[in-house]
A protein has these predicted regions:
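Conserved acetyl-CoA-binding loop-helix of GNAT-fold acetyltransferases
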Residues: 79-86, 208-231, 250
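A conserved beta-strand-loop-helix scaffold within acyl/acetyltransferase catalytic domains
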Residues: 162-210
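N-terminal charged segments
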Residues: 1-91
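A short, well-structured alpha-helix characteristic of acyl/acetyltransferase catalytic modules
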Residues: 144-156
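Conserved acetyl-CoA binding element of GNAT-fold acetyltransferases
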Residues: 66-75, 202-213
Length: 265
């Protein structure tokens, strides 16, 4: 009886990670491919080094901190092979985040340090909640001045000490808005919160969520995340930090699985 469920001999069986497989094969695949787009889009538009192949994608925007540079696996291959290939394809003297949608072996021998196993979370467009309330004014960024304010909030509010003191252009080139949408939350004219949405592979990546101390406890984090989440009528995904998870869960986000994040210092 067991043989009745076996496919015909020689039939090609999809694993879900073939390069030519449609993104919509699974929600996790969409999330992986969308993060690969996120990892390369800003650098590609800014004329900085980037690479997007079958098994991994990555780029180098700067040399001051790992959050500016991403390498993400697109297939369940040996991560050591990806690290070695990244050293050939990209500048090899900069810090970066190494993101794997799968568990990895110990990569310390390759100069990486384990950052953790954060959950990939998803928000489905059919999820109904009451939009979060805040006294912060949420505005979509449309110009260079607004982008610089978003960048400052991200660096000082997240915070990213390796990019301090703040220098405009470390994270966001002027071309960034051509591929992503950014919001800033203001109290009067003071920028206090920010988020970004990047659409690819049929999902929205919600990234770069940060809130300054003066806006915490005022619903700013939830409201600025909600703006990015609902920007496109499609599923939204994000890699959640420890501090962000409770906020995202209240917005209707669900945990899908844990990913693995290493840092090249």
């Amino acid at each position: 009886m067991a043989s009745s469920i076996l496919p015909p001999e020689g039939e090609a069986l999809a694993t879900g990670w073939e390069p030519d497989l449609a993104p919509a094969d699974s929600l996790v695949r969409q999330a992986v491919l969308a993060h690969a787009s996120w990892a390369t889009d800003a650098a590609r538009r800014a004329g900085k080094p980037w690479y997007d192949g079958d098994s991994w994608a990555g780029s180098v925007l700067g040399d001051s901190g790992p959050m500016t540079n991403w390498v993400i696996q697109k297939q369940p291959v040996d991560p050591a092979e990806v690290i070695l290939d990244a050293a050939r394809q990209l500048p090899n003297n900069v810090p970066y985040l190494f993101v794997s949608p799968w568990p990895t072996r110990d990569l310390r021998e390759h100069g990486l340090a384990l950052a953790g196993h954060p959950p990939l979370m998803v928000h489905l467009p059919t999820t109904e909640i009451v939009p979060p309330a805040t006294d912060i004014d949420i505005r979509q960024v449309t110009d260079a001045a607004g982008l610089a304010e978003a960048e400052r909030v991200l660096i000082e509010g997240y915070p990213l000490p390796e990019l301090q003191p703040f220098r405009s252009g470390c994270m966001y080139d002027a071309s960034f808005l051509e591929g992503s949408t950014v919001w800033v939350g203001y109290d009067g004219d003071v920028p206090l919160a920010t988020s970004t949405a990047h659409s690819a592979a049929g999902v929205t990546i919600v990234e770069n969520v940060a809130v300054m101390p003066a806006a915490r406890g005022r619903g700013a984090g939830a409201a600025i995340t909600w703006a990015a989440t609902k920007h496109h009528d499609q599923p939204a995904v994000l890699i959640a930090s420890d501090n962000g998870q409770p906020v995202y869960q209240r917005l209707g986000y669900l945990r899908l699985e844990r990913w693995t994040v290493w840092v090249r210092p």
